[in-house]
Amino acid sequence: ASEREGYFRLQIVPKEGEALPPLPKDVTFAIDASSSIIQRKLDQTARGVQRSIQGLRDDDRFNIVIFRDTPTLFQQDLVSATQQNKAAAAGFLKGIQSRGETDVYEGIRPVIHQTPRTGVPGIIFVISDGRPTEGILDGRTLINTLTDENQSKYSIYAFSGGRTVNQHLLDLLAYRNKGESNVAPQIEEMNQQL
């Protein structure tokens, strides 16, 4: 019999009444706002990201990048999760419109070149349909290039909703970068699941 490689997921649960202290984290939300993302899906995404940012703690840092054919960053680097920065982020997310082409590589590249703090988990949430229309179009090349440039600095979690998703690309991008992917079957579920 041949040995097969396998993978498993381990969930560690503390004893009841002995909660683990939360770790500080550096989180970036990379939001695909191209025309392939219908406005209803983009609105759900913005609400989910805003709610996620509101849940960040004072010792967390965050950033947002909205990408189409070019990226637009909320801030040039990660910022502290102060109430002032959270309010500014809500303003940044307000009214984003679905338009233009999709360059997934250029949307994520500036984020993986930001430096997370030493000893602090770096997390990127990519919210996209995983269907590039500009830049690197080949899924394998896109995943390999981003993974090589990331150098395990960030865990990448991919998220989407609806039925028009390249789940293969999102799954492999997350897997190769120590993350997970999740596709909400209905667009209306995106806000809650994110």
Predicted features, each with a name:
Residues 1-194:
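Exposed acidic/Ser/Thr-rich ligand/metal-binding surfaces
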